[in-house]
């Protein structure tokens, strides 16, 4: 877990790096980079999409292998945004529609999705935490001002503070499932019908008093006011706010029921990284500080999507086609890492792959998804023109 480089960028000689990218011959080790002797140079085409955004298409016909790269410089007038496919869970749409709905310049698929339309790992968009998950999440994140990126194993924490008394309510989960005795859990509008407040519980509804704000030294704060505190057999509606719930007949229930309408509360969540408003999960980490991370060495070649960060802070979004003989064989995790290193990445995270691997540029699907069509995905990483309107 670490901050990665400010986004005052230096140019990367991507043309030189690309001469190595797809020279992974069939006989090479999965983790090797560099050119195969006698191999012809790959075909590389670069197109400027907007200031700070380039699209690179790399073809190696002999292997065969095709890679698609978005090179992103966030010091320019563009924004990296993470988003679920819909307004709330469950969330599933085709990437081309997600890109169009957000007016994005380009986008790739993000975190793997659960079958019910949720992300596997924790996820955040525009300062709102989607949900908590296991303690060993591996994530990529960007600060609200786009000046810093982060990649690693974050320390996710969520709490709600009574601003009048100073009492802190630590959340055991967020938008996941009903509370067990002794637990306090939270549900926001993003949870939708997939993660809704529980029945047979004691709950407090909090109504927002402002937008999410960057917290010091890290994380996000958002202020709320108590609307109602009650115990009921029926779920308490969120009504545009958040609901904090616990099991009835517990000390936690007594504390929540003591909150009176109008009491100001502050929701705080953090990954342990300063200023983060957007974050996406993946698995596994491929590179950290230029050092190869442990990966599956026996995993087969597949379509892949990954995010990388160069030593100068530029972001690389990479999609590799696979499962298409004669077009592109895909890549092992070791080959994916080698490609990212050849592109200049010092930090990299594998995102969702297989039939979900996809890139859209200027409204067009530029790769060939292995399903032969666009798959409905739960979330995406987008590049927006100008500032993010959601923030």
PLM region spans:
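Bacterial N-terminal signal peptides
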Residues: 13-23
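Gly/Ser/Thr/Pro-rich low-complexity, intrinsically disordered segments
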Residues: 9, 22, 28-391
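Bacterial N-terminal signal peptides that target proteins for export
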Residues: 2-14
């Amino acid at each position: 877990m670490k901050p990665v480089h400010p986004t005052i960028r230096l140019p990367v000689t991507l043309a030189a790096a690309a001469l190595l990218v797809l020279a992974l011959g069939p006989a090479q080790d999965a983790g090797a980079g560099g050119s195969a002797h006698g191999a012809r140079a790959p075909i590389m085409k670069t197109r400027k999409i907007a200031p700070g955004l380039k699209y690179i298409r790399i073809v190696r016909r002999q292997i065969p292998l095709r890679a698609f790269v978005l090179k992103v410089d966030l010091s320019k007038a563009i924004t990296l945004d993470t988003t679920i496919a819909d307004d709330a869970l469950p969330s599933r749409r085709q990437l081309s529609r997600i890109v169009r709905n957000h007016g994005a310049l380009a986008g790739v698929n993000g975190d793997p999705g659960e079958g019910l339309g949720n992300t596997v790992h924790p996820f955040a968009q525009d300062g709102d935490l989607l949900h908590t998950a296991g303690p060993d999440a591996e994530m990529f994140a960007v600060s609200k001002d786009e000046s810093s990126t982060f990649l690693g194993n974050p320390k996710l924490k969520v709490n709600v503070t009574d601003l009048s008394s100073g009492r802190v309510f630590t959340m055991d989960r967020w938008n996941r499932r009903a509370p067990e005795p002794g637990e306090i859990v939270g549900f926001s509008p993003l949870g939708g019908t997939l993660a809704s407040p529980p029945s047979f519980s004691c709950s407090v509804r909090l109504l927002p008093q402002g937008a999410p704000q960057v917290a010091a030294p890290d994380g996000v704060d958002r202020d709320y006011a108590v609307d109602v505190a009650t115990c009921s057999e029926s779920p308490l509606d969120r009504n545009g706010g958040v609901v904090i719930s616990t099991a009835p007949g517990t000390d936690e229930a007594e504390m929540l029921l003591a909150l009176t309408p109008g009491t100001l509360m502050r929701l705080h969540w953090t990954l342990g990284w300063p200023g983060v408003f957007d974050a996406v999960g993946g698995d596994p980490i491929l590179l950290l500080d230029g050092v190869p991370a442990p990966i599956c060495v026996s995993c087969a070649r597949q379509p892949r999507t990954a995010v990388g960060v160069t030593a100068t802070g530029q972001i690389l979004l990479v999609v590799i086609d696979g499962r298409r003989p004669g077009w592109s064989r895909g890549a092992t995790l070791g080959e994916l890492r080698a490609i990212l290193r050849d592109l200049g990445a010092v930090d990299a995270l594998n995102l969702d792959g297989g039939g979900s691997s996809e890139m859209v540029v200027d409204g067009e699907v530029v790769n060939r998804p292995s399903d032969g069509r666009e798959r409905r995905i739960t979330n995406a990483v987008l590049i927006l023109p100008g500032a993010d309107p959601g923030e």
